[in-house]
Amino acid sequence: MAETWMALPLFNRQNSPESSRDVLSMASPGLLPIDPSPEHDETNKFGPFDLLDNLPGELQLPADLNPARVGPTTHLPDLTDRADPEPRWMQISDLEVVGPGAVTCPFPGCKSTLRFTGSRELRRHYKQHFKRFFCRYPHCPQAGPGLQGPHPSTKRGFATRKDRARHEAKHDPRIQCPCLDERGERCSRMFSRLDNMRDHVRRIHNNSHYAGQETHGTADAIPDIDIHHEIEARS
């Protein structure tokens, strides 16, 4: 019996399709697949932004906006709807479930201990890791790299268009303080937001000497809307 078994042909492991499988994918089907193409070298196999590539809807980033791929002199476009999906994606179903309907942030190195019960809350937190909107005033420290000169890639941007619009309003404040000074002249302080102006009135003018109007300029009724370049939808 033993001689018959020894006569059997040996298992050709080189030609076996099973031997060519990735060991990691066999051990755990939930791990992200690794692109075996030549373009996928060792430098970006486990890059911190690889997990971005297949988030739904508004979290999809085009390759030219991926911070891991933007050079110091690359011009960042203002809009991000020219998404060019890459082959590696992360699905919401891959998130770690830590309780009944609760998931934690999947971003590598995120120190948040929050647990999210819905996709909307998770997306709102997740995109805070990627400040992909930059100030469009050329000499602002929070402007992205552009034609006016490179800025370090670590410069802080903004997670939403609304946050950027609120910041840009500081470059061109149009809300004037409505109070009068002791000489009866209009206060010259200008603000980009109504709440800041009202706080100034309360602290400095003690809510007195109003000039009869609370706002000034075209931006007063909607101070959080981007009035400098375009009216953008609230995010």
Swiss-Prot record:
Its main location: nucleus. A zinc finger (C2H2-type) spans 175-205. Disruption phenotype: Reduces markedly the expression of hepA and abolishes the production of heptelidic acid. It is found in: Nucleus. InterPro entries: Znf_C2H2_type. GO terms for cellular component: nucleus. The keyword Nucleus applies. Keywords: Metal-binding, Nucleus, Transcription, Transcription regulation, Zinc, Zinc-finger. One of its GO terms (molecular function) is zinc ion binding. Residues 14-45 are annotated as: Disordered. Transcription factor; part of the gene cluster that mediates the biosynthesis of heptelidic acid (HA), a sesquiterpene lactone that acts as an inhibitor of glyceraldehyde-3-phosphatedehydrogenase (GAPDH) and a growth inhibitor of the salt-tolerant lactic acid bacteria in soy sauce brewing. Both hepR and hepS regulate the transcription of the heptelidic acid cluster, but they are not involved in mutual transcriptional regulation and act with different mechanisms. This is Transcription factor hepR. It comes from Aspergillus oryzae (strain ATCC 42149 / RIB 40).
